[in-house]
Amino acid sequence: LDIRTKLALALVFVSLLSMGLISIFAYQTSAQLLQDVSVRQLDALAEGKAMDLAKVHQGWRDKTRLIRNGAELHNGIEALISTHDDAAHQTLTKILTHTALGVAGVERVTVVDTAGREICQVGSAAVFGAIELPEGERDIVYQGVHLSEQKGLLVTFTSPLVVNGELIGGIEVVFDADDLEKVASNFTGLGETGEVVVVTPSKNNKVLVLNSLRHVDALPSPGEIPEEQISEP
């Protein structure tokens, strides 16, 4: 090959090498940009889910307040406390059945006296233990979540019952978790592989998953899984 041909081939090689380097740089830059965009999108989705879950939680609190503040309920409780007779108990049971159980998502309502002793209850959700009345200035208190074999995930709130400035007892309201499930099962923006996992700490290095998962065959409904499983792909 003469010198001109060699120079031409060298220039072509340099040009191809430059194009290759530019392509690699452009690919890496594009990949990083796509990754950054994906992370920002996921952050935005997570923030949106958190806001939706906060609204669900506030909805439970509002419903508890609505039930607690009912004038019929107050009259029924005062009548039962003053008379302790069966007629007053039946009346209070009817009031709770028609008002409290008529509120969407309510599974069980229990009324206790100032000593925490049950005086009336309606609903079919399991009893999880002694009812703890809020102390001090606390109004409505979230008491936690529980798994029931019959009802699935249940959410519990308690509140003191005050009539004319006097504490007459307390109320426990147990909700199903359907509203939470609706939020968690909305996979908009997550494609076919994305997953929404709502968890709360449990014991023995486990977490309680509060919603059903679409990619974990062993957990089609709320339940406990090891902590490390949350980070698995």
Give residue spans per PLM region:
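Intrinsic low-complexity, intrinsically disordered coil/linker regions enriched in small/polar
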Residues: 120-122, 164, 175-233
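Conserved helix-loop functional segments at active or binding sites
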Residues: 73, 109, 141, 179, ...
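Short, conserved clusters of charged catalytic residues that mark active-site
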Residues: 8, 48, 91-95, 175, ...
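A structure-centric signal for secondary-structure junctions around beta-strands
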Residues: 61, 106, 151-153, 167-168, ...
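Extracytoplasmic/periplasmic ligand-binding sensor regions of membrane-associated signaling proteins
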Residues: 55, 93, 97-174
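Polar/charged, Q/E/K-enriched amphipathic alpha-helical segments with strong coiled-coil propensity
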Residues: 80-85, 91-92, 181, 223
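Juxtamembrane extracytoplasmic/periplasmic/luminal helical "stalk" adjacent to the first N-terminal
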Residues: 3-87, 98-107, 153-157
